[in-house]
Curated annotation (Swiss-Prot):
Gene source species: Marinobacter nauticus (strain ATCC 700491 / DSM 11845 / VT8) (Marinobacter aquaeolei)
Molecular function (Gene Ontology), one example: zinc ion binding
Cofactor: Zn(2+)
This protein's name: Transcriptional repressor NrdR
Keywords recorded for this protein, A-Z: ATP-binding, DNA-binding, Metal-binding, Nucleotide-binding, Repressor, Transcription, Transcription regulation, Zinc, Zinc-finger
Length: 172
């Protein structure tokens, strides 16, 4: 690897460590010419499947677009960047592990909803309302009732969290 300081091609690895839960290798290097030290990160190049939109068009997987959608749903919610990054990594892992070269945008949306359901119920309902194009309040009620089933929350608890998010009480 070329030295970023002097451009010399001869460098040696001083230290290597696994980082990012073993998905990345951090290497500390030293230039044999100028003796400057620098750090590099090595990750496997994994190809993400192309996304097939509802109208049939195909486009490359765009992690930043996915992140922006999740961040929008989680706006003003008490979820850390680390939790968001972990959710993104799980989504990407599941998409890659299908072995398919293409994935429908609908499947991608369902993967996002699966992660948001675990991260934050308010964000989940926000995303679901846009993703499923809710037309009236009854669709919100039905989704809140589905969300509250099986996890001990009542529909009132989830609805209260949604309402409180718009007031000073619920802002994080």
């Amino acid at each position: 690897m070329h030295c970023p300081f002097c451009g010399e091609a001869d460098t040696k690895v001083i230290d290597s460590r696994l980082v990012a839960e073993g998905d990345q290798v951090r290497r500390r290097r030293e230039c044999l010419s100028c003796r400057e030290r620098f750090t590099t990160f090595e990750t496997a190049e994994l190809v993400m499947p192309r996304v097939v939109k509802q109208d049939g068009t195909r486009q490359p997987f765009d992690e930043e677009k996915l992140r922006a959608g999740i961040m929008k749903a989680l706006e003003k919610r008490p979820v850390s960047i680390e939790e968001i990054d972990a959710a993104l990594n799980r989504i990407k892992y599941r998409l890659r592990s299908t072995g398919e070269r293409e994935v429908k945008s609908m499947q991608l949306g369902e993967e996002v909803m699966t992660e948001l359901r675990q991260l934050d119920k308010v964000a989940y309902v926000r995303f679901a309302s846009v993703y499923r194009s809710f037309q009236d309040i009854n669709e919100f009620k039905e989704e809140i009732e589905r969300l509250s089933q099986g996890n001990g929350d009542t529909a009132v608890d989830v609805a209260r969290a949604l309402v409180d998010n718009g007031t000073d009480k619920g802002k994080a």
